[in-house]
Amino acid sequence: MQLKQLTLAVLTATSLLVACSDEPKKSDKGTKTEQTALKAADLPQKAEDRYRANLALAAKTYENLYAQNPMRGLTKYQITVKDYQRGDNSATAKSTLTLEFAPHLFGGNNIGAVTLDSHDTITYNQELLAKGIVAHVENHIDTDNAASLKAVLKEQLHASDANIERLVSILKNLKMQSDIYADDNVVATAEVAPFQVQEGDDSLDFKGLKEEVRYNMKTMPDGIFDLNLAVEPFTFTATDKKDGGSATVAVSPLKGGYGIKEDGSFTVKVEPIKIEVTAKDGLTIFELDGVTGSGSGVKYDSALMTYLGDIESNVNNIRVTHNGEQYPIGDINGKSSTQKTASGNYDAGGEFTFKIDGATVKKIEPSIPVEPQSLRVKIKISELSAQSQLDLLQGFEAFQQSLNIAAKTSDVGYMDKDKATAEATANLEKSQADYEKIAQEKFSAALQEAIKNKTRLNYQLEGVTDSGKATFSADMGIRADSATPPEAWQKAIADVQNNPMALQELLKNNLDLHAEARINKSLTDKLGVSQFIESQGAMFITVEGEDYVAKLENDNGTLKLNGKPLPF
């Protein structure tokens, strides 16, 4: 079993289990009115109602937050309950979670449904009610009936039966419980007990984790919740079968969480991270001081399938130490903003800034004549429609599936095939062609939608050094005053393979394009390329002050370079 397979096993098992819990804003007490209104005789029925409602909530949340996005890969999330047996102070029930996945998640293979049964205990009494808790629910996974999960793990990890059983047994030691409050607040926790997996020279020693989710049943479907995760130290060893070398990775405790409130505020915090890798070339330590972030106006938009609002986050003091020698890397800042426009479309943008420790770069590569200081990338899309977003995602899903099938047919190669293999290959090739057609149709639809809405794309790239900076920017979209009807675009796009000039002519007469590249002369001098630029690039470059500049624009159907029509 390879290192990444071991890790995947843990994540796969844990995610399936936690999904089976009730998933989770806690009230210290239920309201006094609600508590006193519940009589002892009413409590069993109330507890059952809340238990069933909380399970149904998981399916509703899936529909609102995940189901529409084809790239999520989860095509079905269903929980059913049967055998609910009620007592005076507790009840038992059997719940079944059924999951189905898109083929592109598993290399194009349809793995079928994965089901997990859970034996649930629902406790209710006056002592709990005094704390505001209507029902305390504990879930126990039935590992004796997990054939579908074992089959998936076996097929995807290619692990021994013993290790598959060991991985599934993790579920037996999984502790999941939920406190459902009278005011509809829920606190759900999932704890994974320590375990070890060994396959040949590869191993995983996992010390456990605990996840806590807090939410309100009324607002959880809108993506409002708090999550905290604590992962105990874990170590894994992987062996390279080719050269016989091995590496041991030790990860220190990981703690973090994030939350989204009803007022649209967002916070995220991850405590310092430390990872040690021991291999034949020595000890390498990767560290960072943590991740912090905040946001406002954050709200899930089911049409666009993402959160709206403004968010900023920081990754602080990234550094690497190799055999005692320190290499400070820098900091990362990220900003995003997604807003709905008056037209019903969306403006979405993101900015990424990497503050670089130039001394470290020079230390690693002394031949570099400058010290990099920062790299900034900024992208903004204006007037993006939800339909265009959906078409793009569906196109990417179909394209991914076609690539998966292509990989399968390439494995067969051009060797002589028996009749069964030849027929199977032919069916795969037909399926691949079908997916390629779907992808082409979806991408075409997304383009038509973007043209109709005059969607614009703005891109900026900036690199700063101790000797100056270089920038590139581009802004493009259909002109605001364009009067070309959608039907003309649709016809040109549909016939682009037979008559590409029709689409080119439409773009030439309707596309608004502005692009600029700029670099400080002080930087080109330091890099030793100033003479080359002036001798070989005079046709494309102009000088503005202390900068070399190249500008490209489409001016009413005429492409211009630095204000002059292109000579070709």
Model-found features: residue ranges?
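Short acidic DE-rich linear segments
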Residues: 7, 22-23
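Bacterial N-terminal signal peptides that target proteins for export
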Residues: 1-7
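Glycine-rich, small/hydroxylated-residue low-complexity segments
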Residues: 24-568
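C-terminal motif of bacterial Sec signal peptides marking the signal peptidase cleavage site
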Residues: 16-19
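Hydrophobic alpha-helical targeting segments used for export or membrane insertion
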Residues: 8-12
